[in-house]
Amino acid sequence: MKRYILLSLLIYVYSVHGQELSSRVSTFLQSYQLPGNSRVRKASLKSLNVNDSKKTITVTLGNGGDEIHYNEDVVGKIYKDISKLIPDSLRSYELTIIGDGKPIEYLIPTAVKNGKAEKRKIWKRDYEDAPWVTNKSCPYEIKKGLFGRHVSLCQSHGRYYDRGKGGWVWQRPRLFCTTEDLFSQTFVIPYLIPMLENAGAVVYTPRDRFWINDEVVLDNDVFDERSGFFNDISLGDDWEESSSRGFANLKETYEGNESPFGMGTSLEVKSTRREKDIALVQWIPNIPKSGKYPVYVCYQSFKNSSEDVTYEIYHSGGVTSVSVNQKMGGGTWVYLGEYEFEAGMSDKNMIMVSNMSRRRGNMVSVDGVRLGSGMGNIIRGGSISGMPRWAEAAKYSCQWNGLPDSIYSSIESDEYRSDIYSRPKTVNELGGGSVYIPNRSGRNVPFEIYMAFHTDAGYSKTDNLIGPLSICTTSKGDGTMNSGLDRYTSRDLASLMFEGVSRDMKKYGLDCRGLWNRNYGESREGEVPSIIFEMLSHQNFADMRLGYDPQFKFDLCRSFYKSILKYICSMHDVGYVVQPLPVKDFSVDLDESSRKVHLSWNPTSDPLESSANPSSYVVYTRKGRYGFDNGRVVRGIGCDISINPDTIYSFQVCALNDGGKSFPSETLSAYISPANSGTVLIVNGFTRLEGPAWKNTSTEQGFLLDEDPGVQYGKFAGFCGRQKVFSKSNMGSEESNGTGYSGSELEGKIIMGNTFDYPYIHGAGIQISGNHSFTSMSESAFQRMSNLGKYAAIDMIYGVQKAFNRQTVDKLEQYVQNGGKLIISGGNMMKSQIIRGRFGSNNSVQSDSLGASRELYVDNHRFDIYRDMNDESYSVPNPDVVIPTDGSEVLVRYGNGSPAGIRKGNVSLLGFPLESIKDESVRNGLIRMLLNGNFSLPAVVGPAIVEPIVDKSSVNDESLDVSDLSDDSDSHPLESEPQESESRTIIEP
C-alpha cells in the first residue's frame, strides 16, 4: 500500500512537472524568435510528451517550427534554449524536438550537415555512363560542377484551354504589365537555365523554353522544299526503315490526343568504327530569318542503341559536334544546343549524323530535326491558342513532343489540372528505367530533381515585400520515392533554396517567408526530389519593381543555381566549385603592323563564394556578322589573336573554373582596313539594365511602358500589355478594376533588350567608310587608358544609358581639347548635366516636344529609329532634341524640324543612338559622314548566300569524299578585381 501511494505520488509529481514544462515551453515560444530567418512566423507548441518509463521528453513544434531551414547551429540553439526550461527533476530525460514531422536534426540538409549523411536521404546508386547530350567541341572540362547530371525545371503555367469558358486563357491574371504565365519565364529562361548548363548539366523543361516564333521541321517522311532537304548516304550498310514508328509532321494542327510521333517512320543502321562503312544523314534547313535557333533531333531508343551518336551542326560560327546517348530519350525532341544560322539554305546551315562509333554493331537511329520553337499547333475547342509554343502550357508541348496522353491528359475534362500533373509526370515518363526511377518503365533519362518556378499572390498596402516561398510535399504513399529514397530529401532541396535566398539576397532586403511541406500536386507527383519555388508576388508592386530588375533576376537565379549545385553534389558525396562571375574591364587593342589584336580583361571576385574564382578563360571569336566559334581556352587575363585585313572580328570572354563557365562578357570588335588613314576607338558605354519606368504615389502605383519600357538582358517576353489601372483603391482584386490591371496587346511578343554587341554595328559603318580601322573596349577599360592620342577618332556608344560616369566624360573632353575627333550618340544624354554641360547646350530639351514626329532626316534622306518595343533592337522612346550652340552645324533633324544631331568643331553629338537606326545603309552612310564629312548610301554589309552543298540526286557512293564533311572552321554585363600578373597566348586564325 505504501509503495502504491509512493508510486502515485511520483506519477503526480512528474505529471505536474510535465504540465509545468508544457506551459513553460508554450509561453516561451510565444515570444521566441526562431534562429535563422526573421520572416518566418513564430513556432507554437503542438504537443509535449513526457515518457517516464523511457525517460524521454518529446516536444513537437508547429507553425514556424515546421517552416524554417534547419542547420547545425539552428538545431543546437533550439535544443539549448528549450533545455533550459526543463525542471531539475527531468534533467536526466532525453529530449527530442520534432518539427515538420521529424526530429529537427533529421531536417538538416545533407549539404550542410556535419558528420555522416542520413542513408535514406542520399542516392544509393549513381549514374556514371554517357550523358544524354554532350558537346564534344567544348574546349574545357567541368570536373566539380554538374557535368553528367540531368535536371528538369518548369517555368510556371501557360496559356491553356478553359472548357468552362470555352476559350484559351492564362492561368493567372494580367497584373502590372504581365501574367505569372509569362513572367516566371523571364527568370528561368535567360538566367537559371544558362547557369545550370554552364555548370555542365543537361536541362530539360516540359514547357517550351526558347523565345523564337519561327520553326523549321525536317523529316525523312515529308519532303517539302520550303523547309529544306533531307539526304541519306551510305558507303556500307544502307539505312533501313525501323520497325518502330517514328515522327512525321503530316498535319498543320493536331486535335484531341493526336501526336506526330507515331505518324511516321524512322531509319536505322548498325554502328561502325570504319570510315569506309560510314552511313550519313543530312538535314539542310531553309532558315526563315538569320539568328539563333535551338536545334532538336528525334530518334528511337533500343536496348542495343549506341551511346555515342555524333551529330555535327554546321552553323555560322563553324561546326559543333554533339554526342547523343541514344539508349535514352527516344521518341521525343532532344535538344542539341542553340546556334546562329543565316537566312536561306547554305553550307553553313546543316545538321549531319553518321553511324561512326567507338563500338560497332550497335543501333543508330535517325528521324526528324527541328529548329526553333514555332507557334502552338494543338487544337482545343475547335481552335488553336494563337500564341507561340513558348507561351502555352506544358501539356501542349508534351503532346507535340511525343509524350503519351496519360501524361498530358490525365484528367481529360480539366485542362488546368492536367497541365499541373503533366509537368512532374513528364519527368517520371522520361526518367523511368533510370537508376533514379528504376522501378518504373520509361525512357531511361537519369533526372535527379524536378523544380517548378512560379510567382505567388499576396500584396502589401505599405510597400513591404511579400518575398519568396519554398514548397515541398513529403506525404505520398509510404513516404518514399520510386527508388526508395525518403521523400524528406525534397525538403532538403527546398530548405537549401530557402537558406540560399535568405543569405544571398540581403542587399535587396529580400528574405524567404517560409518553407512549406504541404500537399501540392506539382511537388507531390514526381518520383525524384521535387519542389515548388514561389519567387515573389506578382500581385505586389514592391516585389514587381524588384522582379523587373535584370540584376535582381541574375542574383536570384545565381542563388538558385548554387543551391541546386550543392544539393546534387551532396546527394553523391562529392565536392563542388561555383562557376565564376563574368569578367570586367574587357578591351581589344589593335596592332596593325603585326596584324594582331591583344585582348585583356580582369576577373570578378564573388564575396559570397570563395570557390568562384576563375582558373582560366575561354575566348570566343566571330568573323563577320554571325556566329561565334567553339572557343579556345586561355590561362591568363589576356591573349593575342591574329586577324586578317578587311574582315570584322568580334570577341567574347567567359571565365572558367572546375565548376563551369561564367556568363559572357560584352562583345567587342576590331577591324584592319587595307587603306587605313587612322584608327577609330569604339567605347561601349551602354551598360544599362533596368526595369520599366514606374510611379508610386499616395493614390497610384504602377509601370509606365510608354514612358520607358526599360532595358532587359537580351530577349524578353514577359509583358502582357500596358497597365490600365493605377489606383491603389482596389489592391488585391484580379478584376478589371483592380490595382495593376493590364492589357493584352503585348502577349506573345518578344522584345529585345541590351545585347552588349554594339561595337560591331558601329564598326560595320566604319568599315564601309573605306579608310579607317577600328578597335573597341568597355567603358571601365577606357577609364584606365592613358594614350588616347593614337586614335583618329573616338566613337562613344551611350544607347539609352541614364547614368554617366564623370571620369569617362573628363577623358573624352581632354581628348577633344588635344585635337581628337569625337562622336557621341545616345537617347538620354541631354538629360544629364555631365554630358550636356560639356558637349551640348544647356538649353537642350527632351523628346517630349517631338509629339507625333517619329521620322528623321539626314541630307534629305528619311529614316526611322526603333522608338517602340520590338524584337530587333532595344527601343528609344525618348530621343533627345539637341539645340545648336554658336558655331555648331545641324547634321540630322527630326520630322518636325527639331535638330537631332549637331557638329561643332571635332565633336559630333547625336540625340539618338546610331545603332537604333533601322535602315543599315542609312546608318552606315551617317557613320561615314561623321568620320569623313560626306553622306551617301553605301551597300549593306551582308553574308554571302550559297546553295546547299549536298544534293542526294548528284551523289553516289564512289564519288563521296568523307573528308569534305569534316569540321573546316577556323581554328558583363552582370558583375566585376584585377589580377596582378598577366600572361599572353598567341592564337592564329
Task: Locate predicted features.
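A glycine-rich, often tryptophan-bearing local segment used as a flexible ligand/cofactor-contacting loop or short
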Residues: 796, 800-889, 895, 926
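Aromatic-Pro/Gly-enriched surface loop or interdomain linker
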Residues: 191-199, 207, 381, 667-792, ...
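Active-site-adjacent mobile loop/cap segments within catalytic or ligand-binding domains
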Residues: 266, 350, 354-357, 368-376, ...
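Beta-strand-rich modules
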Residues: 640-660
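Non-catalytic propeptide/linker segments at domain boundaries
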Residues: 60-61, 65-169, 359-361, 366-387, ...
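A short beta-strand element within beta-rich, extracytoplasmic domains
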Residues: 279-303
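Extracellular carbohydrate recognition and processing domains
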Residues: 316-346
